[in-house]
Amino acid sequence: SAALVWCGPAPGEAGRAEPLHRFPDAPARGRLLFLLFSTGLLGIGYEVLGIRVMSQVTENTVYSFASALTVYLLGTAAGAAVFQRTGARAGFEAPLAALLALLAVACGLGLAVLGAARGIYETARAALGGGFAGSVGAEMILALAVFGLPTLLMGALFSLLTQAMRQRDGGVGQALAVNTLGAALAPLLFGVVLMWAAGSKVALLIVAAGYVALLPRFRPLAHGAVLAVLLAVTVLVPDLRLLHLHPNFKLVTAREGVRATVAVVDDNSDHGSGAASLNKPPPRLLVVNNRFHMGGTGPGEFLQSRQAHLPLLLHAAPRRALFLGLGTGITFAAAGAHPDLIGDGVELLPEVVAVIDQFQPATAALYSSDRLRVHVADARRFVQAAGEPYDVIVADLFHPYHDGAGALYTVEHFDAIRRLLAPDGLFCQWLPLYQLDEDVLKIIIRSFLKVFPEARGWWCYFNAQTPVLGLIGEARPRRYPADWYERRVTAPQLADSAASFGLGSTLLVLGTFAAAPRDLQAFAGPGPLNTNDHPVVAFRAPRHVYRKDRPGHANLLALMASADPDPAGLLEPGGIDLAPRLGAYVRARDTFFRARILIDSGMQREGEDMLVDSAGVSADFPTGYETVLYLAEGYRRANRARAVELLKALNSARPERGEARSMLEQLQQQR
């Protein structure tokens, strides 16, 4: 299109009146074209870099980027309009020099504003009352602080240059074409090459220096003043890696990349000075753009490893597996315990891949086994381009409100995955229920069922505060024999690994069953689907992160209210003997969930009593029993009577276990 514009005037342009203001001191056409190209390059370069740095502070939703773009475009338009009314009579060279010098200063000041971006955003958000409107308003205020003055000057400069190009043979069209060409190259030069090679601060200083270099002639006073401002900014703003870490976090390493700033931190929150903590390193976490915690070692290994083991164990004999999204790499590394499995792991951010070694020994398999291959790629494109089918595909916990992540929950993406599965393959999409509004969760489940109508739901682990649901879709629902685990798990390494993460028997694997297809269909109900042409998740999911007023267990409770899972339907006819135990296990698990929800809701006593009920339902589900023991230990000094009451009830519910009775006897001896 730029070439077509270059060939001549736009329709009707040659017939328009002469411009109101001619510039007798306008430079030659070649220099004008160079200025138009350069200012387009620098202007969009500043925008790309500004948005990239702000992404470390804002919520990174579609509204965050819309706010920045709105301010940028409105500022440019306003600057052009104001200049047409007030500055067009002042000739060409003097306004050009002034605008270029002011733009260099404005970009330098913008760099300083970016250094204070967190304070600006948090102050504005608090002043506006938070919530959805307040948060989006704060993002717009931050964008105004970063882009306001520079874009006004950019608009005025573009107006000046196009006015100088205005001729009867179509100069404005050529001006726009050349300026757009420079703008088109800016994301590659500044957002990729310079961002990767020098970092955001140096890249922004290069933008400011670029405007200085375009000044018509050397003026010692003007050049000196501009360079003094840029030097001051360079010294006063030490870094634009706006790391904002919890006081108990200790930075291990950080990388500033094209798309994100990635940090690895040690979490010393619960790491005291006792002997146990001296011998055990603190949990190590992966943090992206300050907001996204992508898992880590310590307690997080349990969840992340189960994300790999559970879907793989539900397949009879997986030979090829694909993992979409790596994070710390712990989930993908857990797949290395499955013998003869060849795995491909796909991660969008190269900076994340570069720090996976920081999570050893949990990720050691990625370095010791040639069966696990890591790819830096976009998950959607990798799925579309992959050739050989996979037996198991596992999609990680994508943050649904993050700009671009909504596309990973579309019908089209799910359908592309279905076509990539082997005939007996299965696909597991993990969902962070605590990061979703109920209506968004229903849209995702509805979209998944559109492609996998026989999908089932599975709990990754039994945490009511941060529940994680796996949607597992396959061509036809499987049924499992009572000795499934014994048949499936024969390698000692796999048996040890699965058992260490609570998946050491058929009962424990199938006991994660959460919802049958009919349960998911009843919960999701009728409504819109998330598609490429109707990306409702991208626009609705951010409401949750902006409001932050919904408890993590809300979706867990809503799904449990709609579902009545019958785990007996998972078993082959010959496995009927396991059905009563499996049913009791699921009932005890759900009772435990409800007990934890009561406690989290402030109903401590009622929740504790329900934990005792959970212990009494199934001897195979020990979590309720062990939780009550832990609570009773905490009550020993603060509320001895309550401790005795809980221990008596627990011993009555499960008398064959001796821990409650032993603790009760100790308390009675201490009278």
Regions found by a protein language model. Give the residues of each.
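Alpha-helical segment of the N-proximal tetratricopeptide repeat
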Residues: 566-567, 578-617
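Alpha-helical transmembrane segments of multi-pass membrane proteins
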Residues: 1-478, 484-487, 541, 546-548
